[in-house]
């Protein structure tokens, strides 16, 4: 399974999954249709599936046009998003699976950013070392999504599930927010040397107009404050120990950053 990162809108990423064996494709969170259609034209591939993580317009905006072009495709999304995702045909819950390119993806229910958010995890095959997590707006490189419909406690539980995946998991998040996320992170985790190194690397990458997605989960565990609610440095700066309260305090600080 080849993964193509397609920039869209001002800072979105759409991910096109390509099965070279039968020249079919699936797409994760098509904000708009045009980049997907252009990529499919270049590949000569047929789109057979849309995997939506949540209902926000910048994740489902391309669904309708893609369905018009490929009327046989199947649209997957959360059971909790019924009626909110255009063209949705499959309603997924925690523990469900999806199939593509000979791989089985596991569905995680990860409410917080929205009440129905899900993530798709494709573990490595026997001859692979790295798995792939499509997490929408739950985890960002260096950050996490705002809590529009959920609570800090929900988000801690959701991110906690994803945090337990193998360190060598690629995090395919849906936005290029990394530089701003790390600019905030260094203010709350000041003595984190891994974070300082990553911040400087991202500054250089963005100056060169390089993408910073995907990242690796192991790197996020070391440097992303929203995966580090149980670390003394974050507990100290918030003056709290309870995971949801630590997380909520840091999220509030980021919202006002």
Curated annotation (Swiss-Prot):
Residues noted as binding Zn(2+) 1 in the record, renumbered to the chain: 54, 56, 113, 137
Co-factor binding details: Binds 2 Zn(2+) ions per subunit.
Source domain of life: Bacteria
Metal-binding keyword on record: yes
Catalytic activity: an S-(2-hydroxyacyl)glutathione + H2O = a 2-hydroxy carboxylate + glutathione + H(+)
Record key words, sorted: Hydrolase, Metal-binding, Zinc
UniProt-listed InterPro entries: Clx_II_MBL (IPR035680), Glyoxalase_II_hydrolase (IPR050110), HAGH_C (IPR032282), Hydroxyacylglutathione_Hdrlase (IPR017782), Metallo-B-lactamas (IPR001279), RibonucZ/Hydroxyglut_hydro (IPR036866)
UniProt GO molecular function: hydroxyacylglutathione hydrolase activity; metal ion binding
Pathway where it operates: Secondary metabolite metabolism; methylglyoxal degradation; (R)-lactate from methylglyoxal: step 2/2
GO-annotated biological processes: methylglyoxal catabolic process to D-lactate via S-lactoyl-glutathione
Record-listed Zn(2+) 2 binding positions: 58-59, 137, 175
The keyword Signal is assigned to this record: no
EC annotation from Swiss-Prot or TrEMBL: 3.1.2.6
Cofactor: Zn(2+)
Family note: Belongs to the metallo-beta-lactamase superfamily. Glyoxalase II family.
Record's function text: Thiolesterase that catalyzes the hydrolysis of S-D-lactoyl-glutathione to form glutathione and D-lactic acid.
Subunit structure: Monomer.
Protein name in the entry: Hydroxyacylglutathione hydrolase
Lineage per the UniProt record: Bacteria, Bacillati, Cyanobacteriota, Cyanophyceae, Oscillatoriophycideae
Gene: gloB
């Amino acid at each position: 399974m080849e993964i193509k990162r397609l920039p869209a809108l001002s800072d979105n990423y759409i991910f096109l999954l390509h099965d070279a064996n039968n020249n079919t494709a699936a797409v994760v969170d098509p904000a708009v249709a045009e980049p997907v259609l252009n990529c499919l034209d270049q590949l000569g591939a047929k789109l057979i599936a849309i995997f939506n993580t949540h209902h926000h317009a910048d994740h489902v905006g391309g669904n309708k046009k893609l369905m018009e072009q490929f009327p046989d495709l199947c649209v997957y999304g959360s059971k909790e998003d019924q009626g909110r995702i255009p063209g949705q045909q499959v309603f997924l819950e925690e523990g469900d699976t999806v199939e593509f390119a000979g791989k089985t993806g596991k569905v995680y229910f990860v409410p917080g950013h929205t009440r129905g958010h899900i993530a798709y995890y494709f573990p490595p095959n026997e001859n692979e070392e790295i798995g792939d997590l499509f997490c929408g707006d739950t985890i960002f490189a260096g950050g996490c999504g705002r809590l529009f419909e959920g609570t800090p406690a929900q988000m801690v539980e959701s991110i906690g599930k994803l945090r337990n995946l193998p360190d060598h998991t690629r995090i395919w998040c849906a936005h290029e927010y990394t530089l701003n996320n790390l600019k905030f992170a260094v203010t709350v985790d000041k003595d984190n040397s891994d974070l300082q190194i990553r911040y400087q690397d991202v500054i250089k990458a963005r100056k060169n107009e390089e993408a910073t997605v995907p990242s690796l989960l192991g790197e996020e565990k070391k440097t992303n404050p929203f995966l580090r609610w149980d670390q003394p440095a974050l507990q100290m700066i918030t003056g709290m120990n309870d995971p949801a309260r630590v997380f909520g305090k840091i999220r509030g600080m980021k919202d006002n950053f």
